[in-house]
Amino acid sequence: MFAIMTVTGQDHTGIIAAVSTALAELDVNIHNVSQTIMDKWFTMILHVGFDDAALTIADIQERMTSVEKEQGLVIRIQSEALFSAVNDI
């Protein structure tokens, strides 16, 4: 399954490392990533893939909650199909 993840928050060292480490621990593969810093704000969009027989989007979001708290971020994930449907409207 594929999903789109967004990460936003005040820029600081270690954001990409924290997010990618948590995803790797879940065996979630990052297929594509785009990130930018606007003034002091960090923004990143990731296209990720994972085995939906072993893991759900809710499982990933739950794991990312600790990264959000530790890093002071807002992290959201949704299925690629839902993301595409909403953005096609």
UniProtKB/Swiss-Prot annotation:
Gene3D superfamilies in the record: 3.30.70.260
UniProt cross-references to InterPro entries, sorted A to Z: ACT-like_dom_sf (IPR045865), ACT_dom (IPR002912), UPF0237/GcvR_regulator (IPR050990), UPF0237_ACT (IPR022986)
Pfam family, one: ACT_6
Superkingdom: Bacteria
S-S pairs: none
ACT domain: residues covered: 4-78
Entry-linked HAMAP family: UPF0237
Entry's family note: Belongs to the UPF0237 family.
Protein name per the record: UPF0237 protein CE1668
